[in-house]
Curated annotation (Swiss-Prot):
Subcellular location, principal: cytoplasm
Catalysed reaction equations from the record: L-homoserine + acetyl-CoA = O-acetyl-L-homoserine + CoA
Record's function text: Transfers an acetyl group from acetyl-CoA to L-homoserine, forming acetyl-L-homoserine.
Gene label: metXA
InterPro entries assigned: AB_hydrolase_1, AB_hydrolase_fold, HAT_MetX-like
Composition-biased stretches (Basic and acidic residues): 12-22
Binding locations of substrate: 238, 368
Protein name stated in the entry: Homoserine O-acetyltransferase
Residue numbers annotated as active site: 168 (nucleophile), 334, 367
Every AB hydrolase-1 domain range: 63-372
Annotated compartments: Cytoplasm
Subunit: Homodimer.
Phylogenetic lineage: Bacteria, Pseudomonadati, Pseudomonadota, Alphaproteobacteria, Hyphomicrobiales
Region annotation Disordered: where it falls in the sequence: 1-32
Length: 399
């Protein structure tokens, strides 16, 4: 049995803000008769997936676009965030008249399994024990996230998605969708991502995880029950990760060596420089909306991601015979997922016989460029979806 209901807040007990008035998140609950099979061998049941929708599904159910969020994102793509009150994380791209036009497409975005904004994760309650899962929650993978999304799409009565779109960890999910469900994805827009996590990126994630686990308030993952939260460790993890989302040029342009509210150094360990103050703010604000254990689980899921590993190490074999149309996007200053990674994906798609276009966008805004106001990226996304829509026969009146 599958139940769908509204939710009024995220899973983490520290987060008490009310959900935005419009649109309200929905949550699909899957009971014990519909378990989620995980790569670790566990059948997770019951579980729930929180999601948002924007726009209307057409009568043919042919205009649905699934957006897959990145590591620290959630389902609140284009509405005010219920915890922070800030605009949706992709409000630049999603909305009426925008590339992902909500007056033409039916947009879906779900919080990934293992997340902390309504979907089942380590901050949820284990129904067998009545306790918060904590580290008893099973380790999850990108394929697990996609299986859960597919179950949600089934619940919504949608057979084929017009497009699957996402950047970073979201882009990994896009690629996994195309491998696991090739007949269900008409077009795909993977952005600033790769088909496997690099050693460098695994190293950065391990740094963040160790920062969390070294915080005395982490309490071996049982901090919720003990009324604590590893704010310092999670804040440091966020600061370190955030540096990888930027670029040297962007940091120089935005901050340089400028002082923060002073003309001379204090000769102390206060935040003398603007860039220090900025990073501290990134860390302190992040801990107010994200669960520390979820951070551990989701970074580990990214680390395990390797599409070729399930195809005898031959990446092209994963895409062989696919009919999905692809547009792969990278950014010149992205050193977290450099253009070479995207080119390798494109080469594999070509070798597999896929229809694929590739765009490398010149910008100094680093990995986070896909979340920012980059007109060239908007133009490419719009043109790709327009072309795919014409190929599929999506007339304006039908969208």
């Amino acid at each position: 049995m599958v139940k769908v209901q509204s939710i009024s807040g995220p899973a983490h007990p520290e987060h008490r803000a009310q959900e935005a008035d419009h649109p309200t998140s929905q949550v699909a609950t899957f009971d014990t008769d519909q378990p989620l099979p995980l790569d670790c061998g566990v059948d997770l049941a019951p579980f729930q997936i929180a999601y948002q929708t924007y726009g209307k599904l057409n009568p043919a159910k042919s205009n649905a676009i699934l957006i897959c969020h990145a590591l620290t994102g959630d389902q609140h793509v284009a509405n005010p965030h219920p915890v922070t009150g800030k605009p949706g994380w992709w409000v630049t791209l999603v909305g009426p008249g925008k590339p992902l036009d909500t007056s033409r497409y039916f947009i879906i975005c779900s919080n990934v399994i293992g997340g902390c904004m309504g979907s089942t994760g380590p901050a949820s309650t284990n129904p067998e024990t009545g306790r918060v899962w904590g580290l008893d929650f099973p380790v999850i993978t990108i394929p697990d996230m996609v299986r859960a999304q597919a179950m949600l799409i089934d619940r919504l009565g949608i057979d084929t998605l017009f497009s699957v779109v996402g950047g970073s960890m979201g882009g990994m999910q896009v690629l996994q969708w195309c491998v696991a469900y090739p007949k269900r994805v008409f077009s795909a827009l993977p952005i600033a991502c790769s088909t496997r996590h690099s050693a460098q990126n695994i190293a950065f994630h391990e740094l963040g995880r160790q920062a969390v686990m070294a915080d005395p308030d982490w309490r071996e993952g049982r901090y919720v029950e003990q009324g604590t939260h590893p704010r310092r460790g999670l804040g440091v993890a966020r600061m370190a990760a955030h540096i990888t989302y930027l670029s040297d040029a962007a940091l120089h342009r935005k901050f340089g060596r400028r002082m923060q509210d002073r003309e001379l150094p204090t000769f102390s360990f206060d935040a003398d420089f603007q860039v220090e103050s900025y990073l501290r703010h990134q860390g302190s604000s992040f801990v107010e909306r994200f669960d520390a254990n979820s951070y551990l689980y989701l970074t580990r899921a990214m680390d395990y991601f390797d599409i070729a590993a399930d195809h005898d190490g031959v990446l092209a074999a994963a895409f062989r015979g696919t009919r999905t149309r692809f547009c792969v996007v990278s950014f010149t200053s992205d050193w977290l997922f450099p253009t070479a990674e995207s080119r390798a994906t494109v080469h594999a798609l070509n070798a597999g016989g896929a229809r694929v276009s590739f765009a490398e966008i010149e910008t100094d805004r680093g990995h986070d460029a896909f979340l920012l106001d980059v007109p060239e990226f908007f133009d490419i996304a719009h043109a790709f979806l327009e072309s795919a829509g014409k190929t599929r026969g999506l007339a304006d009146a039908e969208r």
